[in-house]
């Protein structure tokens, strides 16, 4: 089957993308690494020795950045529905985050040690129909917030990809109830046409 004009356009944009070229040059698995690096440069959310949970981790761009910045004394637990090539000293749980059994496996892997930071770059498979995509995206955000509320230490931080639309304002209010400070970030490496933003919540108040 011949490729559509849309897929031709996507491929051209992808390979012309300066962040894709930078990722190939710098050894990162995806352009998403630069989104986290930009946020890190501004907000310094990652430090040596931290315990971090990375949701929606595949192919591993955020895990690569995180692992490097938390160092040998740090601990990183990552999860995705898709497989991810191993990264040294990273514990990876493959499975559907919306599945209770996978959620339980992730909690088991985290164990009793309080987590300093939960990061999530999760997004559902987009159909292009906003009325269908937005509720699925917000459901993943709700689950990520639930996990963060269970595992974060008091004072811990939460960074999550979120899409403007139905449910956004309610979610923002919910996050503000549990954290001291909430800010929105739109990295330069996030494509202009994308509705994605990153919500950064700092200073978890405790369960």
UniProtKB/Swiss-Prot annotation:
One of its GO terms (molecular function) is rRNA (uridine-2'-O-)-methyltransferase activity. It comes from Azotobacter vinelandii (strain DJ / ATCC BAA-1303). Keywords: Cytoplasm, Methyltransferase, rRNA processing, S-adenosyl-L-methionine, Transferase. The gene is rlmE. Its main location: cytoplasm. Pfam families: FtsJ. NCBIfam families: PRK11188.1. The active site is at 161 (proton acceptor). PANTHER family: RIBOSOMAL RNA METHYLTRANSFERASE, RRNA METHYLTRANSFERASE 2, MITOCHONDRIAL. This is Ribosomal RNA large subunit methyltransferase E. Its EC number is 2.1.1.166. The keyword Transferase applies. The keyword S-adenosyl-L-methionine applies.
């Amino acid at each position: 089957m011949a490729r559509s004009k849309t897929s031709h356009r996507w491929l051209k944009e992808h390979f012309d993308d300066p962040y894709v070229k930078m990722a190939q040059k710098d050894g990162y698995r995806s352009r998403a690494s630069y989104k986290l690096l930009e946020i890190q440069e501004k907000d310094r959310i990652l430090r040596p020795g931290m315990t971090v949970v990375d949701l929606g981790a595949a192919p591993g761009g955020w895990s690569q950045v995180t692992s490097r910045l938390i160092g040998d004394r740090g601990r990183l637990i990552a999860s995705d529905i898709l497989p991810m090539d191993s990264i040294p000293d990273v514990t990876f749980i493959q499975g559907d985050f919306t599945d209770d059994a996978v959620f339980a496996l992730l909690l088991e892997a985290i164990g009793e040690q309080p987590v300093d930071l939960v990061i999530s770059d999760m997004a559902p498979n987009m159909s292009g129909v906003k009325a269908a995509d937005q509720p699925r995206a917000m459901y993943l955000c709700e689950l990520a917030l639930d996990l963060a509320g269970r595992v974060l230490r008091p004072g811990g931080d939460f960074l999550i990809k979120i899409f403007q639309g139905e449910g956004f304002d309610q979610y923002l209010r919910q996050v503000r109830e549990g954290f001291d400070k909430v800010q929105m970030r739109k990295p330069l490496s996030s494509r202009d046409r994308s509705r994605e933003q990153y919500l950064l919540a700092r200073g978890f108040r405790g369960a």
